[in-house]
């Protein structure tokens, strides 16, 4: 009797289905929000000052990129609802795994950005973000990084 009204909890690890440009951008903005939290956590848990400083710098880059992407999205597709950004958690435990996750997911996002001319600014900003990711991958590799 009650089985018919009970809901199955959502699995937070399930893959989101991307059906529209709105879904694509909101999904990636949620990843960026989650990465900001993960970057802060890794920054606070950093074993050495060098990686602590680089994670702090990369956090600023993440935030600036997320803000520009969100504003560009809204300039094209209209305002988003105030409760739509919820942050997708990251389970990485060190800076190198973290930057690799950011890199691979950003490249997937980049390849899905619509090709219409109106999206070229977003594409260009994403290319700059990819360049920053590559830079910080190199810098993180110079640091003493051990699993936490």
Language-model features: where?
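Helix-loop segments that flank and shape redox-cofactor active sites
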Residues: 34-57, 79, 112-120
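Conserved alpha-helical segments that form or flank metal/cofactor-binding pockets of metalloenzymes
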Residues: 50-81
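Acidic/histidine-rich alpha-helical segments that form the ligand environment
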Residues: 85-140
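Hydrophobic packing residues in well-ordered alpha-helices of helical domains and bundles
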Residues: 25, 32, 55, 99, ...
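Charge-dense, intrinsically disordered terminal/linker segments
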Residues: 1-24, 121-124, 147-148
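Disorder-to-helix initiation segments
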Residues: 17-29, 35, 92-95
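Long amphipathic alpha-helical segments
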Residues: 75-79, 139-148
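Long, well-ordered alpha-helical segments
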Residues: 28-44, 69-72, 105-110, 133-143
């Amino acid at each position: 009797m009650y089985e018919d009204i009970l809901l199955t909890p959502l699995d937070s690890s399930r893959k989101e289905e991307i059906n529209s440009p709105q879904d694509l951008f909101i999904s990636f903005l949620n990843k960026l929000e989650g990465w900001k939290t993960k970057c802060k956590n890794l920054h606070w848990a950093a074993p050495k000052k060098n990686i602590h400083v680089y994670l702090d710098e990369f956090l600023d880059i993440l935030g600036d990129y997320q803000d520009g992407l969100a504003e560009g999205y809204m300039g094209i597709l209209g305002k988003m609802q105030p409760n739509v950004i919820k942050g997708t958690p990251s389970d990485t435990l060190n800076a190198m795994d973290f930057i690799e996750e950011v890199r691979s997911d950003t490249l997937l996002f980049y390849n899905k950005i619509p090709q219409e001319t109106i999206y070229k600014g977003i594409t260009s900003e994403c290319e700059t973000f990819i360049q920053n990711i590559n830079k910080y991958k190199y810098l993180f590799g110079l640091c003493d990084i051990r699993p936490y």
